[in-house]
Structures are given as C-alpha cells and as structure tokens.
C-alpha cells in the first residue's frame, strides 16, 4: 500500500533522544507507515551554540537501534540558511516584516505578547531582529487529536520574530519553509508546539504554501510538570532492549500492545504498532505524567 502521505520527525540536536522524543517519533512513524506513507528525518540545527557535539550522530544511531527506517537523506536546517534569507528579504521588501531593536528588558511585563514598539519606527537592519507583522485576526484549525484550536494573533501573540538579532533564523520561519520544501502533508509532533501552529498557518498563507494536517500528541511530563527534555536532564534512551521503551511509548499513545511485546525485537515492536495503529486512541490532553505510564 502506498499513499501521498509524507511525514517527518525533526529532532533538535541540543542533546540525546529521551522518552518524550521517542513518543513523538513513534507517533509520526506509525501514522505514516500505517497508510503506506513516507517518513523523513530532519535535523533542526538552527542554533549552533546550543548544539551538543556528536548529538546528531547519536540521534540517528538511536533511531536505527530502535528500528526506525527513514526515507531519503537526512536534511539539516543549517544547510538551508540561504533559502531562509531569501524569504526574509522578500518579506522586508513587501513591508510585511520590519527591524526591531527592543531588548528583553523592554519587553518584560508584556506576557510574551509583542506590544509593537518598533512596528513603525523604521529602524535599520543592523543589530536588529526581524519581526513579521501579524493581522488582527483569529486563526483556527482542527487538530486530529486536540480538536479545534483558536488563536487571535494580534491579541495573543503580536508581531513575532523570524530572524534573531544575532542573525540566526527563528524556528517559526524555518519549519514552515522546510515542511513546504520537503512536501510534508502531515505534521505529528508534541503538544508543546500547538500554540505555535497559528503563526505557522499565517506564514503559510502569506507565502502561498499548502497547509498540512496537524496531530499534536500529549507531552510527557515529570512530576514537577516540566516536560522531559535536555534542559531538565532527562535520561537518554537506553541502548539495549529497545522494545520495552517502544511498548511504553505505544501505551502513552493510547495503543494497546500486549505485555509480551516488551520482550520482542525493536523491529517487531514497531511492526506491531504499524499493524494496529489507531490515532483515535491517542489521549486528547496536552500532557501525560511519566510516572503513570
């Protein structure tokens, strides 16, 4: 069975894969393979100062040990900077973006919503971030798991950064351009990115790009409520006995694997997941406590 489905897993090499990463990888992989779709791997290495040496290779080796097989070459965002630069220039020329010299201190007290201080200031680009003007509109989309999501860009976000003051490109810009460039039809990722999606929809609309389908899976969190991640020193995935974490990830996604699957090989665990995948079973919540899994 083949289909037009193209999915992707896009880790950030600021550390090694942990259980939360595995849940996202399993969800995106099974959602693609269950319908005969393609599954790509992309390194979101936008921020070199935060990248851990050797993490990219370690991530790929972990995916292989856990039975994942991706299609095509691994793409890297660090190789796409000229494409991002061209779009930033296009948006500046059209008046849809502008230079912003605001410091973090100036923006304290605005709850992350940009107040528009530089919107009509006409600053030069030197030593400035680039922000995208947003409309006073509510954006709406229906997530395959989380349901209807609404966000008023003007009131809840404000003009947002597409290129940082240090010249590095923002995630919101890069992810939209790369998903379009790679022909991604379905984005399956963690619910921590649900709030970013309306900004991405707006960019897709501005640039005349097609809108993929979205599925945001619950985020695995620690007892203190923080998500599993490199910032909180979450343990990396074990190198051996991959089927046990894979089976646990299947349970986190609402699937019903037999207990004995934890003793199988990694490829057998993923094959079971592909054969029995049912996205409607994924819990409709933003977070899942790790200790309950």
UniProtKB/Swiss-Prot annotation:
Its cofactor is Zn(2+). One of its GO terms (biological process) is tRNA modification. A motif ('HIGH' region) lies at residues 11-21. It is an enzyme of class 6 (ligase). Its EC number is 6.1.1.-. Zn(2+) binds at residues 100, 102, 114, 118. GO terms for cellular component: cytosol. Binds 1 zinc ion per subunit. Pfam families: tRNA-synt_1c. A motif ('KMSKS' region) lies at residues 227-231. InterPro entries: Glu-Q_tRNA(Asp)_Synthase (IPR022380), Glu/Gln-tRNA-synth (IPR000924), Glu/Gln-tRNA-synth_Ib_cat-dom (IPR020058), GluQ/Sye (IPR049940), Rossmann-like_a/b/a_fold (IPR014729). L-glutamate binds at residues 8-12, 44, 171, 189. ATP binds at residue 230. The keyword Cell membrane does not apply. SUPFAM superfamilies: Nucleotidylyl transferase. NCBIfam families: PRK05710.1-3, queuosine_YadB. Belongs to the class-I aminoacyl-tRNA synthetase family. GluQ subfamily. Catalyzes the tRNA-independent activation of glutamate in presence of ATP and the subsequent transfer of glutamate onto a tRNA(Asp). Glutamate is transferred on the 2-amino-5-(4,5-dihydroxy-2-cyclopenten-1-yl) moiety of the queuosine in the wobble position of the QUC anticodon. This is Glutamyl-Q tRNA(Asp) synthetase. It comes from Pseudomonas aeruginosa (strain ATCC 15692 / DSM 22644 / CIP 104116 / JCM 14847 / LMG 12228 / 1C / PRS 101 / PAO1).
